[in-house]
């Protein structure tokens, strides 16, 4: 049985596909959170899904039990779903894919995504991801990425040469290799998230990816509630950093580097005395947030 299931075979106009995957390409969970927000924001309806049975080890990615609105207990399985938003004011419709990087049979899974792209006659495919980087939390979220399509690269300010990275890759890398081999228009776009702040969710990162997604498809981004959440998050981060000398010193170092470099480094910078590990900084930051949530009387 084919693991790709269509609830409705949509007739679409030159659709743009925005894809997000949880896992390797989802630092701080911002990409998939942005994908889910876009589904609601654009009132997209599910049109297809991939059966998880072949692709996940349920010991590692366990299904979740919950109660629905009718008070009935349900089991929710790991999902890779596609949602359609028809846009009569644009020249193209929009498909949003929100899923989880599979554990097994990556080539088979990639083949199913490619089958979906071809059956829906997708005009352009964009993956929205997030990676950990040594960037200032207070600066606007920096995006990196590339496209093999010169027009897409020019429109979005992306590299045309692609990344020179060599080493382990994720589903996003595998999928873009398949798209390139089929000569299909695509772009890979990454939000650079500060590795020393591992708090989830990260409203500032989610807002940035949502804005980028709306920019790609040509829609306005009027998001006052998300903007307020992002400002509040930055305030809480600043308070946390002020409480910890090691994190504060690291941020000061980043501020000095920002004055000397135009692009963020994606490897930890040395502190004044010794390198401070990302795990150490993240642990200190998380401890501060837990104390803030408990309140002073419980500390």
For each predicted feature, which ranges?
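N-terminal short beta-loop-beta anion/metal-coordinating cradle
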Residues: 1-99
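A conserved C-terminal secondary-structure "cap"
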Residues: 197-299
């Amino acid at each position: 049985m084919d693991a790709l299931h269509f609830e409705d075979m949509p007739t679409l106009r030159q659709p743009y596909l925005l894809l997000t995957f949880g896992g390797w390409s989802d630092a701080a969970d911002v990409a998939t959170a942005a994908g889910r927000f876009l589904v609601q924001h654009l009132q997209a309806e599910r049109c297809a899904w991939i059966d998880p049975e072949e692709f996940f080890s349920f010991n590692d990615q366990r299904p979740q039990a919950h109660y629905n609105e009718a008070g009935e207990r349900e089991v929710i399985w790991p999902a890779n779903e596609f949602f359609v938003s028809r846009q009569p004011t644009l020249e193209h419709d929009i498909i949003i894919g929100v899923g989880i990087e599979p554990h097994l049979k990556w080539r088979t899974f990639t083949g199913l995504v490619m089958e979906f792209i071809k059956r829906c006659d997708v005009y352009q495919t964009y993956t929205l991801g997030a990676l950990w980087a040594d960037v200032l939390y207070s600066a606007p979220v920096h995006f990196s990425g590339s496209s093999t399509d010169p027009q897409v690269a020019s429109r979005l300010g992306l590299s045309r040469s692609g990344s020179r990275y060599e080493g382990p890759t994720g589903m996003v890398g595998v999928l873009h290799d398949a798209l390139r081999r089929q000569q299909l228009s695509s772009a890979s776009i990454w939000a650079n998230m500060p590795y020393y702040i591992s708090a989830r969710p990260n409203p500032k990162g989610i807002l940035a990816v949502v804005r980028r997604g709306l920019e790609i498809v040509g829609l306005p981004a009027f998001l006052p509630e998300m903007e307020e959440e992002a400002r509040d998050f930055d305030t809480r981060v600043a308070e946390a950093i002020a409480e910890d000398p090691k994190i504060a010193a690291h941020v000061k170092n980043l501020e000095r580097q920002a004055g000397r470099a135009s692009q963020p480094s994606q490897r930890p910078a040395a502190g004044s005395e010794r390198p401070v590990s990302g795990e150490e900084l993240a642990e200190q930051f998380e401890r501060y947030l837990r104390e803030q949530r408990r309140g002073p009387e419980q500390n």
